Amino acid sequence: MLAPALNLPKWLEENSHLLQPPINNYCVYHPSAPATQGYTVMVVGGPNVRTDYHINPTPEFFYQHRGSMLLRTVDQSTSPPTFQDIPIHEGSLFLLPANTPHCPVRFADTVGVVLEVPRPENATDCMRWYCKGCGEIVWEKKFHCTDLGTQVKEVVEEFAADDEKRKCKACGSVRSVRYEDGEVVQPPRAPE
């Protein structure tokens, strides 16, 4: 028997406490569940002001349910790579291509839904931090992703705990784990 449709506003009323830092997400559909094989669907809340960029070997689908978010991306097809901020407004959809470094910045009282497909068995995800000063890669860690919520948290905590990992080899500045207040500005709720 198929499960009933998920009423997102009702789910949020009853479960918003599950959207806790540092990752702020909750998996409502998991690929290991018989009824939802092939998809991971996460409800993601704000604020999330981590500075890490995730590189997923598969595409990611974003739907912004409440408020607006900023998806910071890196276009690696240019030399040097181009940093591009993509606002995703309330009610908007966005499909992020596979292997695109991205840093989803979510603000207070915002909620989105992210859909992912399972990674191929030999695929690796990557968590990466770029230097705020010179744009070089400060540190990265690759891993085979089997549990996004726990594995991302572990890598973020590993980076946060080690000042040497946070130090840029090119210019010597130290990368913070979180954006400072005012460093990233929330886009308007709707496109202008």
From Swiss-Prot:
It comes from the Eukaryota. One of its GO terms (molecular function) is ferrous iron binding. A divalent metal cation binds at C131, C134, C168, C171. Its main location: cytoplasm. Substrate binds at E60, R106, E116. CDD domains: cupin_HAO. Its EC number is 1.13.11.6. It catalyses: 3-hydroxyanthranilate + O2 = (2Z,4Z)-2-amino-3-carboxymuconate 6-semialdehyde. It is found in: Cytoplasm. O2 binds at R50. It is an enzyme of class 1 (oxidoreductase). Belongs to the 3-HAO family. NCBIfam families: anthran_nbaC (TIGR03037). Catalyzes the oxidative ring opening of 3-hydroxyanthranilate to 2-amino-3-carboxymuconate semialdehyde, which spontaneously cyclizes to quinolinate. This is 3-hydroxyanthranilate 3,4-dioxygenase. It comes from Coccidioides immitis (strain RS).
